[in-house]
Amino acid sequence: MLGIMDHHQDTVRKCKSEALPPERRKRTVEDFNKFCSFVLTYAGYIPPQKEESSWSPSSSPCTHDLSELSGEGSVKDSWTDSHSDLNNIHNLVYKAETDSSSSREFSHLPSDNSLDKMTLKDSLNHVHSKAERKKVKKLDRLSLGGPRKSISEARAHKQSKAALKKIKTSIKAERHFTSSSPLNEGFEKEELTEQAIHMHEAGLKLESNQETDLSSCETDTLVTDEDIMVESGDDSWDLITCYCGKPFAGRPMIECEECSIWVHLSCAKIKKSNVPDIFYCYRCLDSRGSTVKRDH
C-alpha cells in the first residue's frame, strides 16, 4: 500500500512539475480596433499611422493585469475608449473617401488646352447648327411654295382653257352670224374678222402672262365673262338681236330659218347637247300657225 501511495505522489509531483500549456488570451475591443485599422490601411482608405512608442499604457502588461483585476469602472473606461476609437476610425474612413473622390474629380478635370479645344468645338457646332437651320428653313419655304405654285399653275391653265373655249365659240357664232345675215355682208365681215384676230391675240397674251408670272396667277389672271367683254371693245359684243333685249356677249346663239334673227339658246330653251338643225323662233312659229289656220 505504501508503495502504491508513493507511486501516486510521484506522478502528481511530475504533473505539477511539468509546464502547463499557456492559456490563450481573450480578444478585447482594442484588438478588434487594431485589426480594423490594419485592414483599412492595407486597403488604402487610411494613411499608414506612425509606429507607436515602445511603451504605451495600452501595450504594457501592467495595464492588462490591472484591467483584468479591476472591476466595473475599468470596463466602463475601456468601452468609452473603444467608442472613441471607433469614432476616430469612421472619421478617417470618411476623410479617405472624400480625398479619393476629390482626387478623381481633379483627375477628370480637363486642362487649359482641352478647355480651349472644347470651346472651339462648341463654337463650330453652334455655327454648323445655324447653317443647318437656315438650310432647313429654305427647304421648308421651297417645299411650301412648290405645291402653291403647282396649284396656281393648274388654276391658270384651266382658266386659260376656259377663256380660249369661250373665244372659239364666240368666233364660230360670229362667223355663222355673218355668213347667214344678208344685211351686213360687206362691212360687218371685216369687223368680225378683226374682232376674231383681237380675241385670239388677247388669249395668247393671257397665256404668256400666266406662264411668266405664276406668283400673281391667283389674283391677276382670273378670266371671267365681264373681263372678256371689257378687253374686246368691239361693237359685236353689244349687238342685241335676241327678244330678251340682252347683248350677244359671247354666249351661244341660234339663227331662225325664216327671219334670220339670232336667239340665245337659253332664251329658246335649247340645250347645247341638243341643238336642232332647223330652228324657228316663236314669232315665226306663230305666224306660220296663223297662215295654216287661214288656209284651212
Curated annotation (Swiss-Prot):
Pfam families: PHD_2
Signal peptide range in chain numbering: none
Positions of PHD-type zinc fingers: 239-287
Highest taxon listed in the record's lineage: Eukaryota
UniProt-recorded Gene Ontology molecular function terms: zinc ion binding
UniProt xrefs under Gene3D superfamilies: Zinc/RING finger domain, C3HC4 (zinc finger) (3.30.40.10)
Major location (coarse): nucleus
Gene Ontology CC entries for this record: cytoplasm; nucleus
Metal-binding keyword on record: yes
Region (Disordered): 50-80
SMART domains: PHD
Alphabetical keyword list: Autophagy, Cytoplasm, Metal-binding, Nucleus, Zinc, Zinc-finger
Subcellular location: Nucleus; Cytoplasm
A Gene Ontology biological process term: autophagy
Domain observations: The PHD-type zinc-finger domain is required for negative regulation of autophagy.
Classification via PANTHER family: HISTONE-LYSINE N-METHYLTRANSFERASE SET-26-RELATED, PHD FINGER PROTEIN 23
Similarity comment: Belongs to the PHF23 family.
Protein name: PHD finger protein 23A
Species this chain originates from: Danio rerio
Lineage: Eukaryota, Metazoa, Chordata, Craniata, Vertebrata
